[in-house]
Amino acid sequence: MGGMPILKLYNTLTREKADFRPIDPQNVRMYVCGPTVYDYAHIGNARPIIVFDVLFRLLRHVYGADHVTYARNITDVDDKINARALRDYPGLPLNEAIRHVTEKTETQFLEDATVLGCLDPTVQPRATENIAGMIEIIEKLIAKGHAYEAEGEVLFDTRSMDDYGQLSKRNLDEQQAGARVAVEAHKKNPGDFVLWKLSAEHEPGWDSPWGRGRPGWHIECSAMSGRYLGDVFDIHGGGIDLIFPHHENEIAQSRCAHGTEVMANVWMHNGFLQVEGRKMSKSEGNFITIYELLHTEKFGGRKWPGEVLRLAMLMTHYREPIDFSIKRLEEAEHLLSKWPVYGDAAGEADPAVVTALADDLNTVAAIQALHALAQKASADSRHLGTFAASAALLGVVPKEVELDEAVVHEIDGRVRERLELLKAKNYAEADGIRADLLARGIQLKDGKDPETGERVTTWEVKRSQV
């Protein structure tokens, strides 16, 4: 880590930005809440995928790729999944229908993440593969007096924990139950939440000391993070909407089960996303999935490349709300068009880019530094390696464009036309053709044929779209 800047991260737990000190620099551990695979991920889901991928890249850069463990879960047991399975596959047994829904949705999510330029996390555990760990935690909570059985459910007793609410800073006396926690008469306290619930005969379920049932929402992440990262780990991330109740309840379960002061030392949350100034919702008609943005013409009448969506997300600091718009995508695409395609160029990342990212993932400043570097690299290819390493930290890779034969033929014709104009000393029109092609991302390079001495012109694509 010699010469590396100290990472400073904003911690929702303390409401402060502070130096990041990993528990073990040889094994830096991060957990991020992944998707519930009942429907394709929407563009709001894309933000944490991208944000924490940048953090993963930065941690690997600072501590070494072999010294960072990133776990992002797949929630594949949930009432929303059951409902979608019944709706989409009414003729199939429920378990088979659920498998169709979860496999299809998980596959699409992983494809989306790849197109958005995200590295694979170190581990991507599924909830259904960790039921035994959930049961073990619940047994510990009951034994320690933090959970109780009531009417076929096991619930966490929020009053049993002296400092419940440490993340959201909510007073338990004033607190209402979260949106996904039903307030019912059998609860000791309104904020008590389900750890385990019985399953009807047709519903998915697993044998447990409390009968055949399935886990509550929050216990899943406690079990998976604990299994792969330990009782206490370095960073827990997710969207700001997860602070309460999900992350608050994760903390309560894990701390009470393991007897620790914290679950994770640093809690990071990305801000909300709205679309064209309005909350994104199906009722507003502005609900857009990542798949639709990348593969259909639903937004702005065209398809958008993954690297454009990624850069558009990173043009706002991760903790700030983001207004997602066609204009924002166009701005990102325009910026990318001015960056060189670097191929297999190798080098060291620019300290200005690293320093910006080390300051609580300041991607805005990092992009500014990267753009300045892109201008240098475009003028002098000796800077391409530095640009390549710096762009890789952001995960933004300007793509070489594959042009169809008709476009290549048209560009070649324009180049020949310009050569004829230059021979005729009609420089104004020749310059006009150069400017037109440059506006489309086609850069011309004039030279001489070494054998004949005649003027020749070559061209190359310098942008992500022509």
UniProtKB/Swiss-Prot annotation:
Keyword Repeat annotated: no
GO biological process, any: cysteinyl-tRNA aminoacylation
Subcellular location: Cytoplasm
GO cellular component term, pick one: cytosol
Class of this enzyme: ligase
Keyword Transferase in record: no
Pfam family, one: tRNA-synt_1e
TM region(s), chain numbering: none
InterPro entries: Cys-tRNA-ligase (IPR015803), Cys-tRNA/MSH_ligase (IPR024909), Rossmann-like_a/b/a_fold (IPR014729), tRNA-synt_1_cat_dom (IPR032678), tRNAsynth_Ia_anticodon-bd (IPR009080)
Binding residues annotated for Zn(2+), in chain numbering: C33, C221, H246, E250
PANTHER family reported in the protein's UniProt record: CYSTEINE--TRNA LIGASE, CYTOPLASMIC, CYSTEINYL-TRNA SYNTHETASE
Subunit note: Monomer.
Protein name: Cysteine--tRNA ligase
Protein's organism: Rhizobium meliloti (strain 1021)
Gene label: cysS
